[in-house]
Amino acid sequence: MQPKIRVRGQYIKDLSFENPNAPKVFLMMSKTPPEINISVNVSSAALPVKPPEGEQASVALYEVALQINIESVVEKLPAFICEIKYCGVFSIEEDEELEQEQVKRALLINAPSILFPFVREVIAKVTSSAGFPPLMLEVIDFSAMYEKQLAENADGEK
């Protein structure tokens, strides 16, 4: 049984862009393409839900955070540094048959997959506004990321 997940809201929680070596770096980029390093992290946290008086909560709320850090370097000189934490509030209908692992997968795979196109657009606009070509991130396989993290955790427990 798949959890019923709904987006209740989404927002930029934190955004930082540094362009420390402009305009020098623009001249350097015309000769040398930048090296771009990207790190991605996904986390989730339960949010308190107050059901109407006399009723039990049948919906659980979670905040899912998609953190992307990007560093662009040209000839060992930082071109730009971009850090964004893009969040969404998601609801999951509680069901007795729903296993915790299914909820975890929905929050760490499905939810960031929903958020990703929006954060990708923000990054493209910010890099463009800073004078760089718009950075279009490749699609991220959140399922593979999740499975890799599970495998690393299992190896760490041995």
UniProtKB/Swiss-Prot annotation:
The gene is secB. It comes from the Bacteria. PANTHER family: PROTEIN-EXPORT PROTEIN SECB, PTHR36918. The keyword Cytoplasm applies. Pfam families: SecB (PF02556). This is Protein-export protein SecB. GO terms for molecular function: unfolded protein binding. Homotetramer, a dimer of dimers. One homotetramer interacts with 1 SecA dimer. InterPro entries: SecB, SecB-like_sf. Keywords: Chaperone, Cytoplasm, Protein transport, Translocation, Transport. It is found in: Cytoplasm. Belongs to the SecB family. One of its GO terms (cellular component) is cytoplasm. One of the proteins required for the normal export of preproteins out of the cell cytoplasm. It is a molecular chaperone that binds to a subset of precursor proteins, maintaining them in a translocation-competent state. It also specifically binds to its receptor SecA. One of its GO terms (biological process) is protein folding.
